[in-house]
Amino acid sequence: MKVLLWHVHGSWTTSFVQGTHDYLLPVTPDRGPDGLGRARTWEWPASAREVTPEQLREDQPDVVVLQRTRDLELVREWLGREPGRDLPAVFLEHNAPDGAVPNTRHPLADQSAIPIAHVTFFNQLFYDNGSAPTTVIEHGIVDPGERYTGELARAGVVVNEPVRRGRYTGGDLLPLLSAAAPLDVFGMGLTGLYERYGLDPDRVGLHDDPPQAAMHDELARRRVYVHPVRWTSLGLSLLEAMHLGMPVVGLATTEAVEAVPAEAGVLSTRPERLAEAVRDFVHDPDAARLAGKAARAAALERYGLDRFLADWDALLTEVTR
């Protein structure tokens, strides 16, 4: 079927467009949030094709995967159709609730025509979804392969816009963690990170917006993956690191406690325990490799691509009946 969706979350979309459908990705002249089109740093198949708003009117979709309330407005404006009534629709909620948690009401809570698909059970539980039908389709990862070497006695962190997102993504924990072992931060929007948290450039390396494949290669050379995130949906970067075969040290918050089994690393709400675990893995390559193999096995079992695509096929089939 023809599936309309906006390029909102590149890593998630990379997995989604691996399916058997025709994926329509709006593109506008400015390639802004309403029309980013195809990815530039991920490899997407030809079935994920760019369409202008004008072309969409001629190439009508069978279903739309909404990811922002703005998408509802654009469907009405560009197609003259009402999502959930004239056009089958699913609202994909990427994010953990914000604001007055656990009383945060989902923007689509007061309707029943469009199901909300959460990406974690934690998110489904903590949102007030009201009368809206909900389901959970957990992440699926395009397996990058077991690339782990751990040859560098350093930790790796992947986070986008840590300066803007502040305590949400745990930037304030980096001084403590980098004292335990040198670490490298990969991601977008890293400018100002040194200044924001007083980080020592001799202990912390910054790698701003590398291509995904290159990032995976470099990340896998680090001894341990660190996930200092306090409050966000389950990061795809964490699952990718597990697929690479990296041991994990992270905060025991949101869905991480479900994703990382005990044998795959260390989760704790005590920053000092995380620093200790980083230090231990850096100084014990054999233990790090063993935990990394357990991490990869767990990720393949729970967050495999085939299961993810099958779950989405089932949901899209259900809403288009």
What are these regions (language model features)?
Residues 283-317, 321:
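A charged, aromatic-enriched C-terminal amphipathic alpha-helix characteristic of glycosyltransferases
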Residues 216, 239-243, 254-258:
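Short alpha-helical segment that forms part of, or immediately flanks, the ligand-binding pocket
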Residues 223, 245:
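A short alpha->beta transition loop at the rim of the catalytic pocket in nucleotide-sugar-dependent
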Residues 126-129, 142-199, 209:
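Conserved catalytic-core segment of nucleotide-activated headgroup transferases in glycan assembly
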Residues 9-12, 24-113, 122:
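Extended catalytic core of nucleotide-activated donor transferases of GT-like folds
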